[in-house]
Every structure is written in structure tokens, then in C-alpha cells.
């Protein structure tokens, strides 16, 4: 059975030292108050409202990564860069990608604890899990063995495949946040029994430490099956701007191949599942599934090489929030939250604060451009910044490829042919918007005095969106300072 991840052997003196480092003196509290007043005055000069009445009906951000969920269901890694993988995701999750990006999709199942969830039969039989299940799905798409195509060419075939599955014509049969399969329910809903129908249990993989200490690898953060996009978008934002903040306390255990990481988090009263400041623990054991050892939760883009540092932060964060739960259940329960609060939680230092939600409806294209210029140096953000899509119903019209109830990282801005664009990263590590306003050419930002290239035509979750489209498709922007 699964092991529990609970705080172990951290000495009282060590914890007191961490608390002391994160606690401000009266003089520092005064300096922080002056800093906040200066920042408010700066935003006022830019004509940016710092206060807004927030709708009580708005939910926190929390969308599951559909590609990761599909891999865990099939127990088989997929090539996320292959356009036809979208067909597999739609088939397994029982919804088109357009429907999966909406607030009532299966990717938000479990967020509303008061909602009644209906369990239905899966399109996959018990014999269709793993290799056999994937091959049967691939065989159902007659054109899958054709050469890979660009997004523009693949989109019509993906739509045609969805029609074959009757997803568009029979929407009432599609999976949703309140209608899920037994297989999906066992994966994304907290449970005391982790055994499935095949009498298998979730596995562990021990990872080395050296390959998991490079916290400046901001573009390797990839979300798993937990709805914690808000935390991972914030993690990527800090790694992009201030990676030194992400150092962790290491304990080498009696067996030198084993170790634990301690991370001190700052309590934020406005966060979902608010907790007092304290430490969380992660181990070198990563949860996996199936013969191919598919990672279940957060991972690095290069997880197959043993790099899992985002998973270690996710474990520690979940352990801080839910110290008495199993590792699996704790991570599931951190789904849904506010990324601007997660920035401060992850910082480990009470000196930092959040800008709060700066509503994009209050910006014009010009004021948003001036704001970004004030927040960037050589096109790159100088403070960790996040951006969130609408989190209410009914949803406004949104571009294909942008998910509702989802948090993203802001990396900077750029200009092309006189038009200005925000450079944004999806913590899924895949899925970008398409259509008018998306910059699909090679462009750049400055990254630690080295030229860092973004291939904006590659589906790696990084995209550049024109300012007017940013205001139309996103709810608010926020940063930590």
C-alpha cells in the first residue's frame, strides 16, 4: 500500500531557524509597508486600478492537464508534440478539446465538493489499458500512420475524428465535471484505496538529487493530473525571474541513496486551503503508473532522464497543506487556488507580497503595454508574474487553445510588425491558442545575459498573444514584489 508523506526528523532548532529567517522584524515590517505604498503609487501613475470588487461567483484556477491524465489512464507515454495525440486525448476523455477547455469539463471534476458526481462506463475496456489500449485507439484513426502534419492541417482531421465519436452531436453523452468514468474517478478523486481492477498499485521511482537541483529550468515545469496549475504557473514564474528563491533544505538519510527535502512556505489567508507558515517535506520517491512508469503528478519535461524537481516542490507544498494525508491524496487536494497567492507561499520569505488581481478589463492596449514596459527589462519580466483566464459561468467567448479556469506564467512581451504581444507559458507544457492575434514566428527575450530563443511555432506551451487578445481572453494579471 501507499506510504504516507509526513514531516520527519526535522529538529525543533532547525524549524525555528527557518521561521526566524522568514519572519520580519518591526523595522522590516515598516519597510515592507513603505514598499507597498510606493508600488500602489507607481501603479496609480500608470492609470492601473489596484482595487476591484471581485465577483463572489468566481472560482479559483484549477484545470487538470488532459495529456497527463490520458497517459495515466492508458498507462503509456504519448508524444505530446504529435498533432494526432489530440485525437487520442479526445477519445479517452470523451470530449473534444474545445469542450475540455470549458469550466464544466472533466478536467475540473472534483473541484466542487458539494456537486454529485455520476460514474459512467468508459469507452475503454479492461483489456484496453496500457499498450493494447493505445494500439486499439490508434487503429481507430485510419490516417494516424500518415506523416505528421502542422497544426493547421491537423485541426480539420481532429474535428472529423471528434465527429466520428459523436462528441459534437451527442454532447449530453460527453464526460463533464459531474459525469466521469470509473477509471478517471479512481485517478483524480481522493480515495483510501489505490488498487485498481487489475490489482496493481501506484508505483514509486527513486530519483537522484543532483539532477533535481536546477530550479532555473523554468521551461521544464509540466503539470500532471492534479488541478494545481495555479501553483505550477507560479513555480515557473519564480524559476524564470528569481530561481535562487527556490533553494530547499536537504537531509541525507542513513541510507545515502535516500534523502528528503524541506521547504518553508509562507501562509496566505486569501489562498484556497489557507495554512499558517510552516514546512513541507518531499522525498526522492515519485509516484508512477504502469509498465512504462508514467509519472502521475508534476514532472520535468525531461522526466524520462530522471529530472523531477517540479514534483519535489509539488510534494512539499501538498505535504505542508495536508500533512496527515497520503502523498497521493495530499497532491490531489491542492487542486484549485490563486496563483498570485501561490507566488508568495512558494517564496518562503514574508518580505514578498502580491499585487493582487489587476483586472484586465480595466486596461487598454496602451496601459497594458506601459505596464509591461515597467515590469520588464529587455523584454523579460523582472518580477514573477502570472495571468488567469475567466473562472465564472457563463464563460465569455474564448480563443481555441486557451483553457478557462486556468493559470499561466507571463514571461515578458515582444513586438512584431508594430504590434505588441505578451509571451505566456501554459504549465501543461503543451496547448497554445490558434487564430488571429497569435505570433507564430521565432522571436526572443533576454535571459540572464544569454540569448534565449523561443520557437513560438512549436507546441511547447509557450506562445505570444497580441495585447487586445490578452484582454479579451484573460481575467486578471498579477505579480509578486
Curated annotation (Swiss-Prot):
<feature type="active site">
    <location>
        <position position="229"/>
    </location>
</feature>
<keyword id="KW-0843">Virulence</keyword>
<comment type="function">
    <text>Thiol protease. Probably an important virulence factor.</text>
</comment>
<dbReference type="GO" id="GO:0004198">
    <property type="term" value="F:calcium-dependent cysteine-type endopeptidase activity"/>
</dbReference>
<feature type="domain" description="Calpain catalytic">
    <location>
        <begin position="169"/>
        <end position="481"/>
    </location>
</feature>
<comment type="similarity">
    <text>Belongs to the peptidase C2 family.</text>
</comment>
<dbReference type="InterPro" id="IPR000169">
    <property type="entry name" value="Pept_cys_AS"/>
</dbReference>
<dbReference type="Pfam" id="PF00648">
    <property type="entry name" value="Peptidase_C2"/>
</dbReference>
<dbReference type="InterPro" id="IPR038765">
    <property type="entry name" value="Papain-like_cys_pep_sf"/>
</dbReference>
<dbReference type="InterPro" id="IPR001300">
    <property type="entry name" value="Peptidase_C2_calpain_cat"/>
</dbReference>
<keyword id="KW-0645">Protease</keyword>
<keyword id="KW-0788">Thiol protease</keyword>
<feature type="active site">
    <location>
        <position position="406"/>
    </location>
</feature>
<feature type="active site">
    <location>
        <position position="426"/>
    </location>
</feature>
<keyword id="KW-0378">Hydrolase</keyword>
<protein>
    <recommendedName>
        <fullName>Thiol protease</fullName>
        <ecNumber>3.4.22.-</ecNumber>
    </recommendedName>
</protein>
<dbReference type="GO" id="GO:0006508">
    <property type="term" value="P:proteolysis"/>
</dbReference>
